[in-house]
Regions:
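Core subunits and conserved enzymes of cellular information-processing
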Residues: 1-130
Length: 130
C-alpha cells in the first residue's frame, strides 16, 4: 500500500456509506493521531486500539444523529504522495467557513488547521473533513 492515510479515509468513507457503527483500520502512530483529531473535533464518538504488536488495529466508532445522518459528509485527502501540499500558518484555509477541519502535519505533530493557525505554524495539509 503506497498511501495508508488515503486507505484509512476510504475505509471510513465506505463504512459511513454502508451505515456501519464502527470501522477497523490497521494501526500506526499517524492513524492514531488522525483518529484523535477526529474525536476532538466531534466527527467520531470514540476510538480504541485492539490487538498486540503487528496485529494492532484502530477501531473507530462513527457518529450519527437521530435521523441516521453521519457527522462526516466529506472526507478527502489533500496532500498525497504524488503531489505534496505544504502551507504556511497564514495560508491554511478555513474549511466551510470554520465548520470543517483540516488535518495538518507540523513540526509539533498532527493538529487541526485551527490549532496550527493559532500556534502560528504551517505544515503539510493531509486531509479535509466536514
Amino acid at each position: 500500500m503506497t498511501d495508508p492515510i488515503a486507505d484509512m479515509l476510504t475505509r471510513i468513507r465506505n463504512a459511513i456509506s454502508a451505515k456501519h457503527s464502527r470501522v477497523d483500520i490497521p494501526a500506526s502512530k499517524l492513524k492514531l493521531e488522525i483518529a484523535r483529531i477526529l474525536k476532538e473535533e466531534g466527527y467520531v464518538n470514540n476510538f480504541v486500539i485492539k490487538g498486540e504488536g503487528t496485529k494492532r488495529t484502530v477501531r473507530i466508532f462513527l457518529r450519527y444523529d437521530a435521523r441516521g445522518t453521519s457527522s462526516i459528509t466529506h472526507l478527502a485527502r489533500v496532500s498525497r504522495p504524488g503531489r505534496r501540499v505544504y502551507m504556511g500558518a497564514t495560508e491554511i484555509p478555513k474549511v466551510l467557513n470554520g465548520y470543517g477541519v483540516n488535518i495538518v502535519s507540523t513540526s509539533r505533530g498532527l493538529m487541526s488547521g485551527k490549532s496550527a493557525r493559532r500556534e502560528n505554524i504551517g505544515g503539510e495539509v493531509l486531509a479535509q473533513i466536514y
